[in-house]
């Protein structure tokens, strides 16, 4: 086992690309720095915040000021080597002390989008500040004001203009950008750099003797694999958008079985034969879902309702509520068939779809068999949703 452990250390050392930080980290850092300013503490050029996974992050402060009982600070978004339209964006937090005891109230101001459609992580009518960034803001503020009632208003001065370059208008998020992030860190997704960093991880899985691995797009699937399926960390490969590439490389390394595990909005593309899942390359998620629903015999009104929903997750929940849960299982099966065809049958592939909350909502028989054989398959209400 020592050799494999050494390989893990070398693998991490080879990651030479630059990471960045999310808009969620910017908002949390600006909020904490503004609280320090409001409290009369020294305002330096950097601010230190806690991250969701227990690490800490130092962020450079861009501008700041205090007018009477309101303090504001801005931080410039740095996406590192990741190609991100929000790179260089100024994120502002304005804070005000309301009372000596109470909650932290988080609001979206100028340049923050407002959710207008259901099916997203934030309900309609609320500012598009996602749950993890909200938690990060609260944790950062509480390091300065442990129990006080604080109003935090997040603003992005260029948000309304920049939002037109994002998916927000299509998702029904109007008037600005979203505050996003699940870890606080932006990890580069440039193709060559990212692919080169993943291949040693596959080699590592082989060195550990794993005949089966999990391929997942990112952090959500990684968490499900670790916590629900009990998959060893070195057998979980975060593939980003490069499904076809990772399937080919896994087959080349004589790995026998692969579980595709991740959010339905990403992996449903594989059911349509899409093996590079970045939105700018191919985005037929809803079209694939509606087409298969029509082939299964769903009525026209239901098809119209599903097609008008802003996200695949919302559509999947609507499908389940209408008693068509079996369709999602068939789509998982279809994704596995397309994946196996992609590598000419050199791998056995199973597919499992999740929601953002980690619930496994659909899978095919190979996915369950791989899970039971190598790791753990959580008790789920299969027969209920297959109906």
Curated annotation (Swiss-Prot):
GO terms for molecular function: cobalt-precorrin-5B C1-methyltransferase activity. The keyword Methyltransferase applies. Its EC number is 2.1.1.195. It catalyses: Co-precorrin-5B + S-adenosyl-L-methionine = Co-precorrin-6A + S-adenosyl-L-homocysteine. The keyword Hydrolase does not apply. Pathway: Cofactor biosynthesis; adenosylcobalamin biosynthesis; cob(II)yrinate a,c-diamide from sirohydrochlorin (anaerobic route): step 6/10. InterPro entries: CbiD, CbiD_sf. Gene3D superfamilies: CbiD-like. Belongs to the CbiD family. This is Cobalt-precorrin-5B C(1)-methyltransferase. It comes from Desulfitobacterium hafniense (strain Y51). The lineage of its organism: Bacteria, Bacillati, Bacillota, Clostridia, Eubacteriales.
């Amino acid at each position: 086992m020592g050799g494999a452990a050494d390989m893990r250390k070398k693998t991490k050392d080879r990651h030479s690309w630059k990471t960045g930080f999310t808009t969620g980290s910017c908002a949390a850092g600006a909020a904490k720095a503004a609280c320090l300013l409001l409290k009369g503490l020294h305002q330096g050029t950097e601010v230190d915040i806690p991250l969701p996974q227990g690490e800490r992050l130092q962020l450079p402060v861009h501008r700041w000021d205090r007018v009477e009982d309101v303090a504001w600070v801005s931080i410039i978004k740095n996406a590192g080597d990741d190609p991100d339209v929000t790179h260089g964006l100024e994120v502002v937090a304005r804070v005000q002390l309301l009372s000596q005891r109470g909650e932290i109230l988080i609001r979206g101001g100028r340049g923050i989008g407002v959710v207008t459609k259901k099916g997203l992580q934030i309900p309609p009518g609320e500012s598009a500040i996602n749950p993890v960034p909200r938690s990060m803001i609260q944790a950062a503020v509480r390091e300065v004001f442990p129990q006080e009632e604080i109003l935090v208003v997040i603003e992005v001065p260029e948000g309304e203009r920049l939002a037109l370059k994002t998916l927000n208008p299509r998702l029904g998020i109007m008037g600005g950008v979203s505050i996003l992030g699940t870890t606080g860190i932006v990890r580069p997704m440039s193709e060559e750099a990212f692919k080169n960093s993943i291949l040693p991880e596959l080699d590592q899985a082989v060195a550990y003797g794993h005949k089966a691995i999990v391929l997942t797009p990112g952090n959500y699937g990684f968490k499900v694999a670790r916590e629900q399926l009990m998959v060893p960390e070195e057998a979980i490969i975060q593939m980003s958008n490069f499904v076809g590439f990772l399937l080919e490389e896994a087959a080349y390394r004589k790995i026998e079985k692969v579980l595709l595990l991740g959010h339905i909005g990403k992996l449903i593309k594989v059911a349509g034969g899409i093996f590079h899942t970045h939105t700018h390359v191919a985005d037929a998620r809803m079209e694939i879902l509606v087409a298969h629903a029509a082939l299964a015999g769903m009525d026209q009104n239901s098809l119209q309702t599903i097609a008008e929903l802003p996200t695949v997750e919302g559509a999947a929940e609507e499908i389940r509520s209408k008693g068509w849960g079996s369709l999602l299982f068939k789509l998982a099966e279809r994704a596995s068939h397309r994946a196996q065809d992609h590598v000419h049958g050199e791998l056995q592939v199973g597919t499992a779809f999740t929601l953002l909350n980690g619930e496994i909502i659909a899978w095919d028989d190979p996915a369950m068999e791989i899970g039971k054989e190598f790791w753990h398959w959580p008790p789920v209400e299969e027969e209920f949703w297959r109906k």
